[in-house]
Amino acid sequence: MKKKIAYCIPGLYLLGGMERVLTHKANYLAAKTEEYEIYIILTEGHDKELAYKLSPNIHVIQLDINFDDLYVVSPIKKITGYFKKQRTYKQRLEACLNKIKPHITISLLRREINFINKIKDGSIKIGELHINKNNYRDLNNFRIPKFIQKKIASFWMTQLIRQLKCLKHFIVLSEEDKEKWTELDNISVIHNPLPFYPEQTSNCTNKKVIAAGRYEPQKGFDMLIDCWKIVSEKHPDWTLSIYGEGMREELQKQINSLNLQDSCILERAVNNITDKYLESSIFVLSSRFEGFGMVIIEAMACGVPAVSFACPCGPKDIIRDQEDGLLVENGNIEQLAEKICYLIEHDEVRKQMGKQAKNNVQRFMIENIGPQWENLFQELLTNNPRS
């Protein structure tokens, strides 16, 4: 009998890491047509195209809740509208699950986590988190005092943990993050899978450093630009290209003020990021925090060694320090510059680390990550047979 697996995610129209990873995993399972029947249940993007190619074997169900509509209304309407939409979501998701009767329902810990354990459709409920515990709800963009932020975050976390304890299982992306969830014993780690593994490999000879990610404070590009000022003074013939979308104005002002316009370039996000990795010799991750750090394994798959802050969470699970990349004390700009300069100045070390990176990163290929999910599904179904 086929195993029915249902994923709950807001939408699949955004060019985001969570959306791409889910698409990759779902396509892997859907290809096993004799074993799995895959459903993806959405609340947003009813009139938008999917960002990533999805297997025709996958059933996409649009509940048409559209929480996104609340972004353009007054604060009062936001509050009343949210609770109304949340009630509608629960009703429609409950009806949907009772209709399709999945064996396992997976929440990506968005709005449904508040009620999914109450839905009695017979499916096993599990959750997967694509950010780390400490940054599950990032309130830094809200203009409210820090002490109020902490109280709100503490309340949210208490509520979340109560729901997570009711799940049959909970998946996080790194060993480092797992250690933070001391309240839970129904937890394990499954890393994100590589989205690609090209036959080509960077020869690590071009005088190019690359970084990629959204232009927002989390990614720490402000620190990277300060770091590049140090690097460029020693190696003016090298360039840094940062690929992404978002709030670029302040970053460009910073580049201009440091007179780095010729060597530090803010590029638009591109569809052919693989080609950009292959043209580069060093990858840098300057994030303040991560859920995992997909861009690191992408660069490594192209044979490009990474220099990364040892931020929470992900880089320490991915990079084998001094073997296939270099880890730097989190937030230490001077040390980041020093490590980049080290790879610039040591050609053979750089090339060898690139080769080792391409070899070591194979452990994240879908052929290795996919079976971990399948084993989990089988274990859960064996231990929790449907009555």
Per-range role (PLM):
Residues A269, R288:
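Aromatic "clamp/platform" in nucleotide-sugar-dependent glycosyltransferases that forms part
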Residues Q91-N98, F147-H169:
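Membrane-proximal helix-turn-helix segments that form the acceptor-binding/catalytic region
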Residues P305-F309:
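Short hydrophobic beta-strand element within catalytic cores of glycosyltransferases
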Residues C8-L15, Y28, K32-I79, K180, ...:
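N-terminal strand-loop element at the rim of the active site
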Residues R320-Q322, L326-I333, Y342-E348, Q362:
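Conserved acidic donor-binding segment of nucleotide-sugar-dependent glycosyltransferases
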Residues E176, P193:
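Carbohydrate-associated surface elements
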Residues G16-H24, K207, A211-I230, P236, ...:
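A conserved mid-protein helix/loop that constitutes part of the nucleotide-sugar donor-binding site
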